């Protein structure tokens, strides 16, 4: 058996009959499975021991040879080889068919490969294969045509007319096999190429398709006649097991039934042929054999599926591979693993950031082998057996050993659904009593976990390498930033925020206000002795050593600020230490909210790195919890004070609405206008009530504190608690014009409550539906971008893209500095006024340089981008730039494709889950959200299409009674006219200038139109900005580079239009880099280059168009992908992640890259080795 790690590629092809016989250990001749009395396999049956190997280890069928000492002997009585029973998982057999049978994949697939190569329609082919028509194989001298179909009557007439010997006709797979074997591929290909030059239209398309199939057979070495099978392989018996249930009945795999039908019909056909039965009977039997083989290979593809008991269709070989429950997705891409456990999680506020609490009994079971080894090493137990007994009986010595074993062995915690890479993190386990896993409160955001009964799984990394990776790459304390946008993900929440907020408030007239203190320690002492209130404004003398001399100053602060600042490094840059007036100030002297905590973490991470940040976070956590307990901020009904002004506002609104109604009744305004105005008035009133409420709340009001600090709740929720609920939407999404006047504090009446239920129910239904949609979107994104890995330092491209700040209307939504941070320049950047060089080409822009460039007022900058990267596989570090999760330059081996897919998919689920939080208050629901993102990534024609101008020019609008027409006049005077359909709103005005690709009417643009007008760059830019718009509306930040990775994968294929002297066929889609390489090859000997256009593929299509057939087959349309790959004899280069997971190799990313794996440390010639290592680290 070959080693699983030493091959570089995998090829798939058609199996010839010889090859199938070569795999086989014998022929299955009988349909019997096992003997019902002895329960032993029948000889020559589907489970025969002589063919497949013994059922029990080292024991033959008849029992003459038992025990391992007879290893390898073939029993002379029963013919069974004495060996391990595991061989029954790998030994195959075969069935010799009495008549050839066509393989349904090649006959029935779309397009029918058999039909193409024979130039017959699938319907004609079906008639021949299923014995409804004869086909002329050799017309000889007669006037019949080759491949002409004859029905029964015509065949008889021809026989009478010409005599039976004067021509050859046949039916069934035999005839087709003869025709296939007669095909001369070289000649057919040459003829088709000639025809191609003359033909056009539909005929040309058909010829190209045929040529493709012929060329595939030519290049792959497959023979066309192998699409018809003479001999059928039988898969090993342990892969289609038969097991005895309680009560003596048997459960068996469906495949056994399907094989039995094939064998029965085959044996019957053999008998009929030996007897010389009449033609019509033999023909019927052959047809039945063909159908049985079809059902075995792909049940239900043609006609009605074969059903088992209870009318359930049987699972055929194809079904074993397909879908979520098939071999690919169920067993190859997702396996269950040993050394794992799961339990409910509870909060562990006393833990450090890198720790998790592991229940004692679970830890003992997970680390059992380690504990046993240690027990023997320490001499507590004499051998492994007694050690095992000690562990199983849980003797007291075991616990001490467990403590030692666990000491520096990280474990992985995972919470389903794992939407992004932060859904699995490593922790240092701490043994805890009880049966629940303890989780650090700060990592809950990353896991999206709460403690209402969530469960989590624990996994133990076994090997030293796995432990090292867990400790250095996956430890929770190191994963503070979100890979999607580089913002901190461990921002303290809820109580921690509330405690910090409470601590940093100040109060006029508090006890001890205005006192002077000599030092911070004195303040703390006074606070502990209750001499001074935590919110009192006091003065403190601060002494510091500056440039070797002691200086002191007096600052105004509160005890709370002093306590809070003990957690925070005092050099984060919030205070300008150069300025003598600010020199002694505390680093944090502003009110702490969730937002400002995020900023503090950001600055600390950039300045001090992850370790110090995690220590700071733990300090903030402890302080926050402590002071939110001391502050005892809680909610009572008396805290919701309904402002008296509310009733005046309502009265005023009622009067206005009455006026609007009167105007409507007098016919001064239309129904629509009345509705609009009423809605507008009530919205305005609700807002006014909310504002009045917020202004009337005391700053120490607990509800206000919770919302203002960002701990929990929002203005909208406070408005509903103590203001008024306002307008609601009906199930259709239309706003009901009667508002809910009451707040929850006052209580809703029956009608108001009923109206409220619409939104709540809609929210729940939406959530359930959209979660599935979002998960599927993520899966497609992962599949399309999974092979994008950083593979090299610099691809050497000269290209880039221009970026500028993004505006929506007059408001800047993303500044230039944000877009430049962490990217490389693609050309020299000069100051727009002075002309000085700000950054040379290929300079990395950190936040400081990016700020500096943006501040000069420069409009746009050309940067290196994933779009223009020239790496054939993956991307290079310079085109990618900064790793968002670490804020450092990206490393070679980083799986940026998967990270991109997760970054786009993960908020998708959240967008969809966020609809129900407002309880159905009328607002912008994200209907245009998820479906819009999907529509863009699938490059579909959008709903509500806008009309786009194909050229740049000046607009002229003409309106007649019947229609409106927009004319665009170019500079050269050409006119292009566009008819505007009724009800469309124009985006352009008469006489203005517009560019090519600009919208004339409102609506979404078809990305394919942009592609044809503005080219590939325009289309990429459009997709990027449109997807960003949707996410931004939801307040989700995703870095551009993630979208760039996916969009690049959508625009990688070229459709060949002109062949030139290349080997590329027109109409074929090919990877951009292969296209370039082929053109360069032709150019080298002066030939004519091929022409082609870049095509925009949706993510599903792009994922199926990948070079790897394993990856595509495990994604969707498994049978179609495999059929195609087998005919072409495709070679899978195993460059992506999925392919390698499927065949069980290490993935070629991270430490699994060949570059890192081939490192060896040689002590003899160490200087050479160190050179290679240095080169890798740079």
From Swiss-Prot:
GO molecular function: DNA binding; DNA-directed RNA polymerase activity; magnesium ion binding; zinc ion binding
Protein name (Swiss-Prot/TrEMBL): DNA-directed RNA polymerase subunit beta'
Protein's UniProt keywords contain Cell membrane: no
Transmembrane stretches, start-end: none
SUPFAM superfamilies given in the database record: beta and beta-prime subunits of DNA dependent RNA-polymerase
Residue positions binding Zn(2+) 1: 60, 62, 75, 78
Keywords: DNA-directed RNA polymerase, Magnesium, Metal-binding, Nucleotidyltransferase, Transcription, Transferase, Zinc
Binding site for Mg(2+): 450, 452, 454
One Pfam match: RNA_pol_Rpb1_1
Role of this protein: DNA-dependent RNA polymerase catalyzes the transcription of DNA into RNA using the four ribonucleoside triphosphates as substrates.
Catalysed reactions, as listed in the record: RNA(n) + a ribonucleoside 5'-triphosphate = RNA(n+1) + diphosphate
Swiss-Prot/TrEMBL cofactor(s): Mg(2+); Zn(2+)
InterPro entries: DNA-dir_RpoC_beta_prime (IPR045867), DNA-dir_RpoC_beta_prime_bact (IPR012754), RNA_pol_asu (IPR000722), RNA_pol_N (IPR006592), RNA_pol_Rpb1_1 (IPR007080), RNA_pol_Rpb1_3 (IPR007066), RNA_pol_Rpb1_3_sf (IPR042102), RNA_pol_Rpb1_4 (IPR007083)
Family: Belongs to the RNA polymerase beta' chain family.
Biological classification of the source: Bacteria, Bacillati, Bacillota, Clostridia, Eubacteriales
NCBIfam families xrefs: rpoC_TIGR
Domain of life from the UniProt record: Bacteria
Disulfide bonds: none
Coiled-coil blocks: none
One of the GO biological process terms: DNA-templated transcription
Top-level enzyme category: transferase
Binding positions for Zn(2+) 2 per the UniProt entry: 795, 869, 876, 879
Cofactor note: Binds 1 Mg(2+) ion per subunit. Binds 2 Zn(2+) ions per subunit.
Enzyme Commission designation: 2.7.7.6
Organism from which the protein derives: Clostridium perfringens (strain 13 / Type A)
Subunit note: The RNAP catalytic core consists of 2 alpha, 1 beta, 1 beta' and 1 omega subunit. When a sigma factor is associated with the core the holoenzyme is formed, which can initiate transcription.
GO cellular component, as recorded: DNA-directed RNA polymerase complex
């Amino acid at each position: 058996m070959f080693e699983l790690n030493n091959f570089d590629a995998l090829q798939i092809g058609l199996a010839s009959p010889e090859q199938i016989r070569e795999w086989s250990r014998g022929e299955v001749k009988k349909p019997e499975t096992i003997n019902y009395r002895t329960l032993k396999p029948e000889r020559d049956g589907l489970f025969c021991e002589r063919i497949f190997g013994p059922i029990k280890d080292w024991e033959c069928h008849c029992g003459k040879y038992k025990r391992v000492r007879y290893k390898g002997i073939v029993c002379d009585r029963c013919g069974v080889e004495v060996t391990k029973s595991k061989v029954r998982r790998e030994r195959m057999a075969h069935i010799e068919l009495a008549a050839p049978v066509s393989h349904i994949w090649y006959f029935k697939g779309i397009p029918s490969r058999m039909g193409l190569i024979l130039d017959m329609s699938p319907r004609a082919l079906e008639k021949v294969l299923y014995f409804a028509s004869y086909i002329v194989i050799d017309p000889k001298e007669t006037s019949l045509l080759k491949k002409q179909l004859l029905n029964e009557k015509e065949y008889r007439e021809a026989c009478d007319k010409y005599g039976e010997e004067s021509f050859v006709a046949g039916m069934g797979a035999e005839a087709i096999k003869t025709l296939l074997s007669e095909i001369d591929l070289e000649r057919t290909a040459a003829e088709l190429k000639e025809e191609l030059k003359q033909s056009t239209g539909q005929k040309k398309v058909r010829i190209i398709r045929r040529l493709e199939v012929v060329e595939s057979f030519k290049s792959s070495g497959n023979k066309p006649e192998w699409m018809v099978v003479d001999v059928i392989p039988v898969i090993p018996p342990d892969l289609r097991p038969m097991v005895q249930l309680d009560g003596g009945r048997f459960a068996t795999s469906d495949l056994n039934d399907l094989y039995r039908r094939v064998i029965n019909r085959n044996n019957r056909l053999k008998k009929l042929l030996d007897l010389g039965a009449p033609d019509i009977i033999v023909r019927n039997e052959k047809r039945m054999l063909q159908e049985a083989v079809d059902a075995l290979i792909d049940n239900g593809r043609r006609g009605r599926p074969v059903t088992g008991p209870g009318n359930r269709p049987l699972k055929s070989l194809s079904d074993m591979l397909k879908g979520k429950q098939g071999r690919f997705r169920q067993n190859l891409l997702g396996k269950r693993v040993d050394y794992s456990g799961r339990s409910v999680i509870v909060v562990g506020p006393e833990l450090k950031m890198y720790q998790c609490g592991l229940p004692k009994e679970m830890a003992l079971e997970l680390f059992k082998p380690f504990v046993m080894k240690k027990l023997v090493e320490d001499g507590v137990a004499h051998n492994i057996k007694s050690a095992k007994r000690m562990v199983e009986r849980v003797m007291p010595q075991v616990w001490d050993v467990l403590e030692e074993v666990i000491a520096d062995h990280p474990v992985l915690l995972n919470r389903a659904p794992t939407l992004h890479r932060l859904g699995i993190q490593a922790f240092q386990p701490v043994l805890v009593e009880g049966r629940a896993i303890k989780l650090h409160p700060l990592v809950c955001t990353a896991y999206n976990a709460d403690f209402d009964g969530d469960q989590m799984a624990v996994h133990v990394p076994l090997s030293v390498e796995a432990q090292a990776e867990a400790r250095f790459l996956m430890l929770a304390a190191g994963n503070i930033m979100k890979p999607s946008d580089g913002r901190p993900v461990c921002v303290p929440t809820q109580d921690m925020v509330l405690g910090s907020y409470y601590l940093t408030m100040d109060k006029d007239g508090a006890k001890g206000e205005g006192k002077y203190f000599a030092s911070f320690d004195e303040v703390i002492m006074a606070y502990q002795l209750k001499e001074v209130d935590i919110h009192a404004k006091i003065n403190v003398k601060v002494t510091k050593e500056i440039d070797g001399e002691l200086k002191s100053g007096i600052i105004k602060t509160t005890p709370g600020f002093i306590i809070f600042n003990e957690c925070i490094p005092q050099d984060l840059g919030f205070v300008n230490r150069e300025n003598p007036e600010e020199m002694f100030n505390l680093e944090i002297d502003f009110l702490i909210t969730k937002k400002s905590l995020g900023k503090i973490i950001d600055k600390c991470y950039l300045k001090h790195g992850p370790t110090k940040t995690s220590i700071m976070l733990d300090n903030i956590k402890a302080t926050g919890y402590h002071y939110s307990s001391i502050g005892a901020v809680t909610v009572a009904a008396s805290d919701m004070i309904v402002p008296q002004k509310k009733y005046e506002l309502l009265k005023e609104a009622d009067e206005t609405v009455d006026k609007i109604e009167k105007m409507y009744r007098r016919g001064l305004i239309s129904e629509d206008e009345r509705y609009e105005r009423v809605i507008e008035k009530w919205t305005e009133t609700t807002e006014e009530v909310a504002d009045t409420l917020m202004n009337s709340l005391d700053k120490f009001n607990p509800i206000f504190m919770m919302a203002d600090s960002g701990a929990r709740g929002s203005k909208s929720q406070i408005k509903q608690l103590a203001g008024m609920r306002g307008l609601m939407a009906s199930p259709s999404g239309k706003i009901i014009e009667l508002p809910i006047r009451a707040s929850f504090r006052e209580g809703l009446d029956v009608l108001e409550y009923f109206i409220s239920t619409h939104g709540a129910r809609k929210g729940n239904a939406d959530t359930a539906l959209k979660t599935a949609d979002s998960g599927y979107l993520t899966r497609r994104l992962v599949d399309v971008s999974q092979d994008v890995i950083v593979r090299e330092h610099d691809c050497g491209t000269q290209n880039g893209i221009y970026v500028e700040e993004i505006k929506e209307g007059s408001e800047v939504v993303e500044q230039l500095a944000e877009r430049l941070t962490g990217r490389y320049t693609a050309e020299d950047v000069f100051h727009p006024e002075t002309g000085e060089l700000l950054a040379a080409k290929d300079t990395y822009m950190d936040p400081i340089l990016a700020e500096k460039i943006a501040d000069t007022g420069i409009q746009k900058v050309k940067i290196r981008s994933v779009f223009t990267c020239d790496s054939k596989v993956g991307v290079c570090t310079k085109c990618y730039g900064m790793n968002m999760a670490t804020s450092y330059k990206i490393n070679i081996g980083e799986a940026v494709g998967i990270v991109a897919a997760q970054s786009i998919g993960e908020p998708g689920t959240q967008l969809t889950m966020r609809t129900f939080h407002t309880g159905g208050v009328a607002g912008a629901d994200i209907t245009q959200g998820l479906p819009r993102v999907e529509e863009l990534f699938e490059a579909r024609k959008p709903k509500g299409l806008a009309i786009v101008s194909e050229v740049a020019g000046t607009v002229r609008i003409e309106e007649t009674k019947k229609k409106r027409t927009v004319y665009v006049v170019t500079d050269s005077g050409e006119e292009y006219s566009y008819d505007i359909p009724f009800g469309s709103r124009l985006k352009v005005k008469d006489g203005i200038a517009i560019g090519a690709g600009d919208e004339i009417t409102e609506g979404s643009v078809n990305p394919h139109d942009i592609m044809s007008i503005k080219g590939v760059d325009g289309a990429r830019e459009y997709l990027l900005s449109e997807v960003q718009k949707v996410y931004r509306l939801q307040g989700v930040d995703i870095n551009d580079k993630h979208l760039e990775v996916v969009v690049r994968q959508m625009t990688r294929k070229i459709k060949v239009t002109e062949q030139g002297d290349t080997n590329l066929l027109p109409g074929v889609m090919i990877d951009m880099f292969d296209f370039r390489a082929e053109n360069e090859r032709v150019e080298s000997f002066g030939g004519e280059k091929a022409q082609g256009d870049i095509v925009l593929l949706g993510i599903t299509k792009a994922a199926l168009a990948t070079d790897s057939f394993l990856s595509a087959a495990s994604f969707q349309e498994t049978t179609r992908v495999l059929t195609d790959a087998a005919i072409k004899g495709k070679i899978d280069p195993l460059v992506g992640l999925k392919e390698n997971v499927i065949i069980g190799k290490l993935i070629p990313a991270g430490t699994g890259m060949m570059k890192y794996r081939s490192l060896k440390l040689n002590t003899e010639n160490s200087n050479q080795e160190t050179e290679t290592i240095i080169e890798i680290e740079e």
